[in-house]
Amino acid sequence: MKKINIVADFAIPFIDECLTNISNVVLANHSNITNSFLIKNNAEALAIRSTVKVNKTLLDNTNVKFVATATSGYDHFDVEYLQNRGIAYFHSPGCNANSVAEYVIYSILKWIITKNIELKNINLGIIGFGNIGKLVARYFHTLDINIYVNDPPLKDENFIFPDYVHYCELDEIFEKCNVITNHVPLTKSGNYPTQALITGKLLSKLKDNSLLIHASRGGVIVESDLFNIMKVRKLSTAIDVWENEPDFNSELANSSLLATPHIAGYSYNGKLNGTMQVLKNIENYFGIKPNYDILNAEMNKYKTNTKLYIDNLQDIFKKLNDNRRFEDDFARMREASKLDKAGKQAFFQEIRKNYPKRYETLNI
C-alpha cells in the first residue's frame, strides 16, 4: 500500500513514532506549516493543534484531504471552506477535559483558601455542559455543592441533565451563583452564538466576593466590561483565555486571582489523549493501523488515581500546585505583563510552544 504523506505539528507527542512505518511523516513547528510547505511535501493529511489556522490561505492548491487537530476545540478551522472543498476534518473532543477541570478545581480551592470561604456557602454555576462542564459538575457533586447549569443547545435536544444539577437560564446563573465557570465553544452564528456572550449586563448581576473562571475561549467574555466591573466590585477572576491572543490584557491579568497563557488544557496527559484521537481518526479515515504500543505505554505510566474529597482539599490543592505549577505560570504572566505588545505576544507563543510536561493529579 502506498504510504500517505502526513505533515504533523511536532507538539503532538509520539505521532511520528506511531505512524512512521505506515506513512511518510514530516514534523514541523506550527509556524512553519504554511501553504508552500504543504505543497513542497505533497501533504495529503495534516495533524495540528490550535496554533495553526486551517483555511483557504493554508490549503488552496494542496493535496490535503484530511485535517485533524489534537485539541478539543476547532474554532481554528474554517469549516465552511473545508466542507466546500470536501476535506475531512476532525477534532479531539474531551481530550483535555480533565486537565481543564483541574484548572477550575485549583482556582476554586485557591479562592476558598485565600478568601476563607466555606464550602457550604458555594453555589457553582457552569455555563456549557459539554465534556468539561460535565466533568467539573461530577467532581463538585462529590463535595455536595449546589450546582447550576446553563446549556440551551443541550436543552433543545431534550438532554436529560443529571439530578445533582439544577438547570437555569443564563441571567439566573449570575444572580444565584458566587462561583461561575464557562466551558462553551467560541461560535459566531447559530441559535446560540457565544462570542461576547458574557457582557457587563450579566457581570453586573454578580455578588460581591464572587469568583469568575474563564478557561473556554477568548472572546466569550467582553474583557473591557469585566475589567470595568472589577474596578467597582469585589470580584475574583481566574483567566486562562484572552480576547486578543497572543496579546493579553496586562491590567486584567495583574488584577486576577490567577492568570495564565491559555494552558489550562495543556497537561501532558491531555496531549497524549489528543494524540490518541488523531491517530484513531487517521486509522478510520485511511484504513491504516498506527502502532499504538509506545503511546499506550506512556499513557499507562501517567494514569491518575487521586479522588476529590471534602477532607483532603488542602492536600489536593498542594498536589495540584506541585504537579501543574499554575503559580509558576502566573508569576511568568505577571512578569510578561510589563512588556510591550510584541514582547507579550512573543512570551505567550513561546510558553505555549515549549510548555513543560505537567501531569494530572485527579481522577473522578
Predicted regions: what is each one?
Residues 1-43:
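N-terminal glycine-/charge-rich "phosphate-binding" loop or analogous flexible N-terminal tail
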Residues 54, 156-250:
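Rossmann-like adenosine-cofactor binding region
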Residues 101-117, 141-145, 276-284:
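Oxidoreductase and adenylate-handling cofactor-binding alpha/beta cores
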Residues 209-364:
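Rossmann-like dinucleotide-binding domain for NAD(H)/NADP(H)
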